[in-house]
Amino acid sequence: MLKRLFVSGYKAHELGIFNEKNPGLAIIKKALKRELVRFLEEELEWVIISGQLGVEMWAAETVLELKKEYPHLKLAVITPFLNQEEKWKEETQDYYRNIVTQADYINSVYQTPYQGAWQLGEKDKFLLSNSDGILLVYDEENEGSPKFLSKLAAKKADNSDYQLFRINAYDLQAIAEEQQQELYNDSF
């Protein structure tokens, strides 16, 4: 049973998304929403993210929107270390803090500031071991930062009842085509 879902994927810059106006962002959010609604109908209770900019924060925005219709849904933000946002641009920090303050649970794997890249790998292991499944926006044909997490999740899924779900480039393309068809149909 999937009650705790870890959501992760590409960072915004890996997808070439630098602002809210990028048309690809709406497609990614629609894909996330579609999957989350499907899981909510199967008793999903928690969405867990680490607060990484990109897919994780877009998933958090989607969760906050879905909470209006699914009030039992909860958002957990478990960062790898304390104050991960402190070196980001002020505007980005404000965006991050606005979302994180609305989470139902906030914590850090390490109760210290950044000490090394190893904390990121340990964060992935921690979140995988404290969730029932992962939804990963990742396409193996377009490698990026989620590659390591994808391999860890696949290994865990192969050796247990852990569930690995992916949204890949083909899924996103299908949603883009649906939107184009809707626009076309609406024009008549």
UniProtKB/Swiss-Prot annotation:
Coiled-coil annotated residue ranges, if any: none
Q: Name one Pfam family in it.
A: YpsA
Q: Which SUPFAM superfamilies match?
A: MCP/YpsA-like
Q: Which family does it belong to?
A: Belongs to the UPF0398 family.
Q: NCBIfam families given for it?
A: PRK13660.1
Q: Tell me what this protein is called.
A: UPF0398 protein BBR47_29830
Taxonomic source organism: Brevibacillus brevis (strain 47 / JCM 6285 / NBRC 100599)
